[in-house]
């Protein structure tokens, strides 16, 4: 089945990461959807990880798979202590371990210097413009964040929050209950 047609996959959230100046923010909505039913409106899908909480992470995808990825990424981060190294090591594991290859989730991760997407195929992608948007409302949030970056002086936190709000107005799998973490 095409993932876009599966009611249990990638329809649970929108995450956006915005980097502006010396600041980076990751925001996520709070809606959890199972099939065509909203199960929860205040889920927390954005977290601080690593020593002293210096890495931000947000997940989109099947909930159990996303939590598994969070745990695996956090273990790599604790072991290697550096965002890019942890992401690459997780991607290596993802490509070699069968159980990981079937996980249907994406992670957006960021520290003070770097923002990355860790994809469901084990790819590690660094955006060229400092903006990441994943999940069911990702395209809407990405468009909103890019417009706000280009035409306003808003800070990273505000842009991330507004982008989720705009996505929440358009995407039925996203709400306006926004959680933001910032470095």
From Swiss-Prot:
Q: Which GO terms describe its biological process?
A: proteolysis involved in protein catabolic process
- Tell whether Transcription regulation is among the UniProt keywords: no
Keywords annotated in UniProt: Allosteric enzyme, Cytoplasm, Hydrolase, Metal-binding, Protease, Sodium, Stress response, Threonine protease
Q: What is its main location?
A: cytoplasm
* Matches recorded under InterPro entries: ATP-dep_Prtase_HsIV_su, Ntn_hydrolases_N, Proteasome_sua/b, Proteasome_suB-type
Q: Which SUPFAM superfamilies match?
A: N-terminal nucleophile aminohydrolases (Ntn hydrolases)
Tell me where in or outside the cell this protein is found. Answer: Cytoplasm
Binding residue positions for Na(+): 168, 171, 174
Q: What does this protein do?
A: Protease subunit of a proteasome-like degradation complex believed to be a general protein degrading machinery.
Q: What is annotated about its quaternary structure and interactions?
A: A double ring-shaped homohexamer of HslV is capped on each side by a ring-shaped HslU homohexamer. The assembly of the HslU/HslV complex is dependent on binding of ATP.
Q: Which NCBIfam families match?
A: ATP_dep_HslV, PRK05456.1
State the name under which the record lists this protein.
Answer: ATP-dependent protease subunit HslV
| Species this protein is from | Stenotrophomonas maltophilia (strain K279a)
């Amino acid at each position: 089945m095409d993932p876009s047609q599966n009611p249990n996959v990638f329809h649970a959230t929108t995450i956006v990461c915005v980097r502006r100046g010396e600041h980076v923010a990751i925001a996520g909505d709070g809606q959890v959807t199972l099939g065509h039913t909203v199960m929860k409106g205040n889920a927390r899908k954005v977290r601080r990880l690593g020593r002293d909480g210096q890495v931000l992470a947000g997940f989109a995808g099947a909930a159990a798979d996303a939590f598994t990825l969070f745990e695996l990424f956090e273990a790599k981060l604790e072991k290697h202590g550096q965002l890019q190294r942890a992401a690459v090591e997780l991607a290596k594991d993802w490509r070699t371990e069968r159980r990981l290859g079937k996980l249907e989730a994406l992670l957006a991760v960021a520290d003070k210097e770097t923002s990355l997407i860790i994809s469901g195929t084990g790819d590690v992608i660094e955006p060229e413009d400092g903006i990441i948007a994943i999940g069911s409302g990702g395209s809407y949030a990405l468009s909103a964040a890019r417009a706000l970056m280009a035409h306003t002086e808003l800070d990273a936190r505000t842009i991330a929050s507004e982008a989720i709000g705009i996505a929440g107005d358009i995407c039925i799998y996203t709400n306006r209950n926004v959680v933001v973490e910032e470095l």
